[in-house]
Amino acid sequence: LSRRQRQMCIRDSPRIIDHPEAIETITYRELRELAYMGATVLHEDAIFPVRQEGIPINIRNTNAPEDNGTWIVGSTCQKSKYVITGIAGKKGFCSVNIEKDMMNSEIGFGRKVLQAFEENGISFEHVPSGIDTMTVFVHQDEFMHKEQKVVAGIHRLANPDMIDIESDLALIAVVGRGMKSTRGTAGRIFSALAHKNINVKMIDQGSSELNIIIGVA
């Protein structure tokens, strides 16, 4: 970790963004979302006991203890001046794209597809779907040497019309408790990606609106 990272949590990777802004306050949920996508500040095992007891954590730099650092809390009413708390990303994913006419009316279709992954010991990351389509995002290194078995399992269990696989994808997590109360955040995110000619493959936003996961090629 750089000195800046040891001092406090930052909003972006210093390997990508010059002089990233510091995070003054972050919730445990926000930190977990960012850590899951590769942000390395504190290991989950290190914060689990104090999180369970609702004890806040203050990260400071031992070389500059007078600085405020970053507070990690269970919840906060403090309104951040930033809509987005942090951004993290991870490479090495692939998507298994499945199509079948009238898929939406077939009871248990999603379960059958995921069963093929379970039988081969592969966990999934995200499962966006449409009326006749379903996509399963998985770690590429876990999937590629079991690809034929998984595809055969999907055909056997779900009988799809088509299966297509895309590799070398990345997932970006945009995390922030302020996104829920701010209109147009997603639009600005996608405008920034389009401005850099980045092809968006998947969008996944939970009902909590705490984060937006974007799959890119």
Residue ranges and their predicted role:
Residues 68-217:
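A conserved regulatory-domain signal marking ACT and ACT-like small-molecule sensing domains
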Residues 7, 14-65:
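Polyanion-binding loop/helix "lid" in catalytic or ligand-binding cores
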Residues 1-10:
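Single conserved hydrophobic/aromatic residue that forms the stacking wall/gate
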Residues 11-13, 203:
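Non-heme iron-sulfur electron-transfer modules
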Residues 3, 57-59, 125, 201:
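Short hydrophobic alpha-helical runs that function as membrane-insertion/retention elements
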